A protein has these predicted regions:
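Helix-loop-helix "hinge/cap" segment bordering the ligand-binding cleft or interdomain interface
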Residues: 122-190, 206-246, 306-313, 320, ...
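Long amphipathic alpha-helical coiled-coil segments
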Residues: 283, 381-387, 469-472
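Extracytoplasmic/periplasmic substrate-binding proteins
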Residues: 25, 189-208, 235-361
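Loop/turn elements at helix/coil->beta-strand transitions in domains of secreted/extracellular proteins
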Residues: 16-20, 48-52, 73-77, 123-128, ...
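Secretory-pathway/luminal and periplasmic proteins that interact with or process carbohydrate-rich
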Residues: 87-91, 173-181, 190-195, 262-263, ...
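Conserved small-residue motifs centered on glycine
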Residues: 313-434
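Conserved N-terminal structural module of periplasmic/extracytoplasmic solute-binding proteins
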Residues: 1-158, 162, 196, 203-206, ...
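Short helices/loops that flank or line small-molecule/ion binding pockets
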Residues: 63-75, 167-174, 249-260
Length: 472
């Protein structure tokens, strides 16, 4: 292994002064990043003779920044990324394997992270990243304006399926004719399904609650047809906002401005508070699909790019961020008195200081985007034990029989691109109720076939079968 050559050389390189450069998402000013880097470095310099330099880039241009950096020789040691974006970067050597460094430099993370989560970031026998310790499962449901829902007089606590929403939506339309009962989120509406998309592109397991490992085209299932018929019917009845699939507005803003009553959403502990924070309305969420976990749900991963001069030092710092609450809080929440203040120190609850808001802070707090939100302070409005609830949510989720399988689409790139274009043409419009599924889905399936969907499905089935065989 890399550090096994001689512990002496590892030791001497480990005493040299080194700066670990970190790229993370979210809005932050250069000045604030510099102050935070300085505060974080105090911890790592004393321990490892290592400084930290944090750069943050807003979500709109983050992926572009990652691609530019990976393609350049500019030094970078640690970066956040959605796992689905990196298979090609891994196969082209732009991201480094870290297997050889974990025992000596990342042993705390190694033991704290579950075997099935490590599998999700393992390619060709090598571990390539560290999965973020956030919710790693999802349920699906419907989030709605509580005041309006209560005013209908309908007992919504008994609603357990998407179909059962209809009487409530009808009543809202009748009582609030100027409000859209359902709004989309930037032109899309989530499906209320528990399929496993096996890492994206076409080809899924129809339901994680079954043992079947047959890879199918989800768009060809009765389940998809029936859900699309329901949505089309609702759109015809005026229960879904018109132009839902072409809207560029965020669902929570539409609910906040009073234009919308409800939206489909992922569910997890604290989802109500999250939507309340963004919409300014009291929210209630109905659970329609019970929580489940797949490889795709282990979706935020920290990587060591090829342009790190000392990957072992990057892994060492990552291990410290994952396990040291003092360091994690500086990087996640910023500086006390500037970016946050305690409202309940005993329970580790924080809020913005006077005059600071979510929109004017110099350092946005995004706990889930960092390696381990579970050791950070909790923002006011959330349950103080939100992180314990999240662990419980993860532990109780239905586990897909393919969790840990990592899809590599390298050999079917042309088909993947062609199918993605077809899916973009029909998917959102069907899912928002804008197209008649009985006439549209057959066309959709024909075009997917012509684009090479069967080739992708066969390749995915082959890889999945190999993986299942190797992981018996």
């Amino acid at each position: 292994s890399a550090q096994g050559s001689s512990s002496k050389s590892a030791e001497s390189s480990n005493n040299d002064s080194y700066t670990v450069k970190i790229l993370a998402p979210g809005d932050a000013s250069t000045d604030d990043c510099a102050k935070i880097s300085e505060a974080a470095s105090k911890i790592t310099e004393e321990k490892f003779n290592t400084k930290i330099e944090v750069t943050r880039v807003g979500f709109g241009s983050y992926d572009q920044q990652v691609n530019l950096t990976l393609a350049s020789s500019e030094k970078l040691d640690l970066m956040y990324e959605y796992c689905g974006n990196v298979t090609s970067a891994i196969s082209s050597g732009q991201i480094l394997p870290i297997t050889d460094y974990l025992d000596s430099y990342g042993s705390d993370m190694k033991s704290e992270i579950s075997e099935s989560d490590w599998k999700c970031v393992t390619f060709n026998g090598n571990i390539y990243g560290v999965p973020s310790n956030k919710e790693k499962a999802t349920g699906w449901g419907f989030a709605m304006n509580k005041e309006m829902a209560d005013a209908t007089g309908i007992d919504y606590s008994s609603i357990k399926t998407e179909e059962e929403l209809e009487p409530l939506l009808e009543k809202v339309k009748e009582m609030y004719p100027d409000v859209y009962p359902i709004v989309s989120h930037v032109g899309s509406m989530s499906l209320m399904a528990n399929s496993d998309d096996l890492g994206g592109d076409i080809g899924s397991l129809e339901s994680v609650s079954s043992d079947s490992t047959e890879v199918i085209n989800y768009y060809a299932t009765d389940k998809y047809m029936n859900e699309m018929k329901l949505r089309y019917d609702w759109a015809q009845k005026g229960l879904i906002m018109p132009d839902a699939s072409t809207s560029t507005e965020m669902a929570n803003s539409l609910i906040g401005s009073g234009k919308g009553f409800g939206r489909f959403t992922n569910t997890k502990p604290g989802i109500e508070q999250e939507i309340e924070k963004e919409s300014g309305k009291e929210i209630v969420v109905l659970d329609l699909v019970e929580p489940y976990t797949t490889t795709t749900r282990v979706d935020i991963v920290w990587y060591v790019p090829h342009n790190s001069d000392k990957p072992e030092r990057a892994v060492q710092v990552l291990n410290e961020i994952y396990t040291n609450p003092d360091l994690a809080n500086i990087l996640i929440n910023g500086l006390e008195g500037t970016h946050y203040e305690f409202t309940d120190k005993d329970n580790g609850v924080i809020n913005y200081p006077d005059g600071v808001t979510a929109s004017n802070t110099g350092y946005t707090s995004l706990p889930w985007a960092w390696p381990n939100e579970a050791i950070s302070y909790v923002w006011e409005g959330n349950d103080p034990d939100i992180w314990d609830q999240t662990q419980e949510f993860n532990n109780n989720a239905v586990v897909s029989p393919a969790k840990g399988f990592a899809w590599d689409n390298t050999d079917v790139q042309n088909e993947v691109t062609a199918c993605a274009n077809v899916t973009a043409k029909y998917g959102p419009a069907l899912e928002c109720g804008s197209l008649d599924p009985e006439t549209t889905i057959p066309k959709f399936l024909d075009e997917l076939k012509a684009a090479g969907a069967d080739t992708i499905i066969a390749e995915k089935q082959r890889q999945l079968d190999d993986w299942l065989e190797a992981n018996k």
